[in-house]
Curated annotation (Swiss-Prot):
Record's protein name: D-aminoacyl-tRNA deacylase
GO molecular function, one term: tRNA binding
Keyword Lipid biosynthesis: no
UniProt-listed InterPro entries: Daa-tRNA_deacyls_DTD, DTD-like_sf
Species per Swiss-Prot/TrEMBL record: Pseudoalteromonas atlantica (strain T6c / ATCC BAA-1087)
GO cellular component, one term: cytoplasm
Reaction(s) the record says it catalyses: glycyl-tRNA(Ala) + H2O = tRNA(Ala) + glycine + H(+); a D-aminoacyl-tRNA + H2O = a tRNA + a D-alpha-amino acid + H(+)
Domain of life assignment: Bacteria
Family label: Belongs to the DTD family.
Free-text comment about domains: A Gly-cisPro motif from one monomer fits into the active site of the other monomer to allow specific chiral rejection of L-amino acids.
Motif (Gly-cisPro motif, important for rejection of L-amino acids): 137-138
Amino acid sequence: MIGLIQRVSEASVCVGNEVIGEINQGILLLLGVEKNDNEEKAKKLFQRVLNYRIFSDQDSKMNLNLQQVGGGLLVVSQFTLVAQTNKGNRPGFSQGASPELGKTLYNYFVELGRSSEILCESGKFGADMQVRLINDGPVTFSLNV
């Protein structure tokens, strides 16, 4: 499971012309599910996202996590994160989860967020979405579990 996290001052996701998820300060997470992923990996990644210290403290050091700053989490499915790009001119997706597994684990991840004490918003799995964000920093990290 791959999570690309971006520290944002605001972010939103639209399907068509409708905003279906939005946050102010927080983390935009692009989530890629691989074929060998499971609920345990989703839990592990969720805890890493929640506790990853990417927000600045009073000394301008990245020392605070999402909960400590009261930030929101916007989760968006991103199948292309799992692409193999090491050769050729076209990405390969053989490591990607089946649509059924991907949707199940994506929804499970979102439910982990919604059952926590943070604001958790979501895109729509498998939809053609437009994502808008203001990347704060910019600060972007790839988390793999």
